[in-house]
UniProtKB/Swiss-Prot annotation:
Residues 59-281 form the BURP domain. Keywords: Signal, Vacuole. GO terms for cellular component: protein storage vacuole. The keyword Signal applies. It is found in: Protein storage vacuole. Expressed in the radicle of germinating seeds 2 days post-imbibition (DPI) and in roots of 30-DPI young plants. Expressed in the embryo and seed coat tissues of developing seeds. The protein accumulates only in seeds and only long after transcript accumulation becomes evident. It comes from Brassica napus (Rape). This is BURP domain-containing protein BNM2C. Residues 1-25 form the signal peptide. It comes from the Eukaryota. The BURP domain located at the C-terminus has not been identified in non-plant proteins. It holds the Pfam family BURP.
Length: 281
């Protein structure tokens, strides 16, 4: 299995993020509201054409986890001009990070409250301020140092903390296509037994912020190999299945994408290329 896994140190994590943003392409997360559409004309690639936002195509059912299953999945190339700055812990700790400080923060970053950027900042701060639901652990990392320390504190009482990411592998980098494609499980997905997992998603904000969350139980982690329909792109990396969705918001988009009754069944998903997945025994 070719997905990236190694014991984590700060220099290794810094190198990893550089590879995600510079060497490899990653999922573009513009500083916009989650409600703003991307407006790309790719509806002809959808299963049924009912979703306009291609980033919704990361969810799947646990019954799909088998050799030969074909799924539409979307990856998008990152525009380096839109990657926000990465702050050190010392720099990040000087800036308040809470919705209660929103007015100060908007003024500090010269962002209008009613702009898409202002709405996106508010949504990020709200998500980071929300209390974890029962059985969940969560935090927001505003620097690499804080994310690494909090990940160790949350799921690894010892040094046995590893990181996984999604990688796109092609024989020629010029042939990478970051669009909605059909991918097929090229190998039997491998379940990683007995591990704790913490998924970290980059959030829209004026500097790099990762929202990290996981569940104390009821989560299955898999390593997967996905081959594009044209046989050119091999995607390797982690996939997670949340076995108990009974506490989820009934309006969660995953239920709509998968066409299942809210809170009635497990929900699985792949990870965008700029996400980080921490795992620990």
């Amino acid at each position: 299995m070719a997905s990236l896994r190694f014991s984590v140190t700060f220099p290794a994590l810094f190198s990893l993020l550089l590879s995600l943003w510079v060497v490899d392409a990653c999922t573009s997360r513009k500083l916009i509201s989650n409600n703003e559409q991307e407006g790309q004309n790719i509806s002809h690639l959808f299963k049924d054409g009912e979703f306009e936002d291609p980033t919704m195509y990361m969810f799947f059912k646990i019954s799909d986890l088998k050799l030969g299953t074909k799924l539409p999945i979307y990856f998008n190339k990152n525009d380096l001009r839109k990657v926000p700055p990465l702050l050190t812990r010392q720099e990040a700790d000087l800036i308040p990070f809470s919705e209660s400080n929103l007015d100060f923060l908007l003024n500090h970053f010269s962002i209008s409250k009613d702009s898409p950027q202002g709405e996106a900042m508010k949504e990020t701060l709200q998500r980071c301020d929300f209390k974890a639901i029962e059985g969940e652990y969560k935090f927001c990392g505003t620097s690499l140092e804080s994310m690494l320390d909090l990940a160790k504190k949350t799921i690894a009482s010892n040094a046995d903390l590893k990181v996984m990411t999604t990688k796109v592998m092609v024989p020629d980098q010029n042939r990478i296509s970051y669009a909605l494609h059909n991918y097929t499980f090229a190998e039997v997905p491998k379940e990683l037994d007995g591990i704790k997992v913490l998924g970290c998603h980059r959030m829209p904000y004026p500097y790099v912020v990762y929202y990290c969350h996981g569940h104390k139980s009821g989560t299955k982690v898999f390593e997967v190999n996905l081959m594009s329909d044209d046989g050119i792109q091999l995607v390797v990396g982690p996939a997670v299945c949340h076995m108990d969705t009974s506490m989820w918001n009934a309006d969660h988009v995953a239920f709509k994408v998968l066409k299942i009754e809210p809170r009635s069944a497990p929900v699985c998903h792949f990870f965008p290329l700029d996400n980080i997945v921490w795992v620990s025994k």
